[in-house]
Amino acid sequence: MPKKKKTIGEKMSDKKTKEDTRMIAQYFQEMIKYVEKYGNKTILLWQSGSFYEIYTIKDPDTDEFLLSEFNEYIKLTHMNIANKHIKYEYNGKKCSVFMAGFNNTDYLLEKWVKVLTDGGFTVPVWYEYKSVGKKKDRKLLQIFSPGCFFKNNKLESEDCNNIACYSILHSNGSLLKRTPSLLFGCANLNIYTGNLILFNHEVKRQNIHNPVVFDELERFNSIYNPQEIIFIHNYEDENKLQDVIKFSGINCSKIHYVNQSKEGEFTAQALNAENQIYQEDIMCKFYNIPDYDSYLKSSTLNERPIALKSLCFLLNFINDHNSKLTQKIHLPTFDNKSEHLHLANHSLNQLNIVDTAFSK
């Protein structure tokens, strides 16, 4: 049986790489962790003295950069590429290390982080906090992403600084011999105002994979238009998942897909977010709730479990990126509306009343 081809991360994490104690090896090891967690559209900015830098390696045989995000970084920033004149072993080859970067000033760091997040990237930033001789210790400053970064313009920021978690969970009804159903649970946070809006909805019907089923999700998404979405689901068919994105009119710069039916970086966290003990821990961590059971009943969160799931996941996700954003968030309110015009959203789109992915 042929050997399974290793990924870039696996190859770079071989024993020889782990024993490499140079700064450049630490950079690649940390970068791999972030790419595995947040996806390929991740760029690690790394302080090196008076500069912030990003590194890549070039294949000596093909003359190609082996880390695709480096090419996109250059396209976005138009920065010069420099040869560091050091080698890094990759896949048995001695590869040259290249870099690009900018001066370490708050102004330039904010400028380029905004450029990168506007381009749909997640941007971990590591800085030097201690120096002993030539040895410099670094640690994470913050993780920036499209939904966790303030826009510079105040008027723009009130409308655009939304980050959301959508949980879409389906049941085919075969176990209980019931009608197939879809559960929707959404949480949207405006990181500028601290307003937190929830939405919970259930649909039961035989033809469950139908654009009309997603009308309420499309309405919620079009109102808040988040810049970043964590999309939790249990679809096995990736084609159906992409249909859901289209049906819902979701078109944002950064989507994190979390399939809780398959092993992945956020799978355990997504499943934990359904755990009642975990939910209580999360809610009491971020809010001063003296009587949690009473709060659940008064807020009706006990009747809307998937919205609570999305809320808990979102709070933890944002706190991991920037804990300051969770310090002044408001208690959540629900967006569920009982009275809507009974006209499907695709029909409204034809009347130019709503703007969705169908019209793009």
Which ranges hold each PLM region?
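Basic, polar low-complexity surface loops/patches
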Residues: P2-K360
